[in-house]
């Protein structure tokens, strides 16, 4: 009986979510079709151009050799500061269990 209630509740939730999503998709489609003013259009064009350059170069755009030297210098500082480990993965820790002395309880 509870399984039937769960299935009924899940179907009600699924239909409510689908109606909500349909409404939101309809509203966003109208919002994205509006015309942009010229300044917004230029701004978006520049962002898209920058993204294309960044993807083509595979890294930062419009940087010289000074930038790469600075990055290398900072990475060297980090390696010196944090133990010269691999910077791309999480470090592994080895914790040893503490050794306790067993003390005899004095009998009274």
Swiss-Prot record:
The record places the transit peptide at 1-32
Q: Which InterPro entries match?
A: ATP_synth_f6_mt, ATP_synth_f6_sf_mt
Taken from the UniProt entry, a GO cellular component term is: mitochondrial inner membrane
Compartment(s) of residence: Mitochondrion; Mitochondrion inner membrane
Give a GO molecular function annotation for the protein: proton transmembrane transporter activity
Q: Which residues carry this modification: Phosphoserine?
A: 108
Modification sites for N6-acetyllysine: 41, 46, 79, 84, 99, 105
Location (main, coarse): mitochondrion
- PTM-bearing positions, type N6-succinyllysine: 84, 99
**Which controlled-vocabulary keywords does the entry list?**
Acetylation, CF(0), Hydrogen ion transport, Ion transport, Membrane, Mitochondrion, Mitochondrion inner membrane, Phosphoprotein, Transit peptide, Transport
Q: Report any one BP term from Gene Ontology.
A: negative regulation of arachidonate secretion
Q: Identify its protein family.
A: Belongs to the eukaryotic ATPase subunit F6 family.
Q: How does it assemble?
A: Component of the ATP synthase complex composed at least of ATP5F1A/subunit alpha, ATP5F1B/subunit beta, ATP5MC1/subunit c (homooctomer), MT-ATP6/subunit a, MT-ATP8/subunit 8, ATP5ME/subunit e, ATP5MF/subunit f, ATP5MG/subunit g, ATP5MK/subunit k, ATP5MJ/subunit j, ATP5F1C/subunit gamma, ATP5F1D/subunit delta, ATP5F1E/subunit epsilon, ATP5PF/subunit F6, ATP5PB/subunit b, ATP5PD/subunit d, ATP5PO/subunit OSCP.
Q: What does this protein do?
A: Subunit F6, of the mitochondrial membrane ATP synthase complex (F(1)F(0) ATP synthase or Complex V) that produces ATP from ADP in the presence of a proton gradient across the membrane which is generated by electron transport complexes of the respiratory chain. ATP synthase complex consist of a soluble F(1) head domain - the catalytic core - and a membrane F(1) domain - the membrane proton channel. These two domains are linked by a central stalk rotating inside the F(1) region and a stationary peripheral stalk.
Q: What is the protein name given in its UniProt record?
A: ATP synthase peripheral stalk subunit F6, mitochondrial
Instruction: Output the lineage of the source organism.
Output: Eukaryota, Metazoa, Chordata, Craniata, Vertebrata
């Amino acid at each position: 009986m509870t399984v039937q209630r769960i299935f009924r509740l899940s179907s009600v939730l699924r239909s409510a979510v689908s109606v909500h999503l349909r409404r939101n998709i309809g509203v966003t489609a109208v919002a994205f079709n509006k015309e942009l003013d010229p300044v917004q259009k230029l701004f978006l064009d520049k962002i898209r151009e920058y993204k294309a350059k960044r993807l083509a170069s595979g890294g930062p755009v419009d940087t010289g050799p000074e930038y790469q030297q600075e990055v290398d210098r900072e990475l060297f500082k980090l390696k010196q500061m944090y133990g010269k480990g691999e910077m791309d993965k999480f470090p592994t820790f080895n914790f040893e269990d503490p050794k306790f002395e067993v003390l005899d309880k004095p009998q009274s």
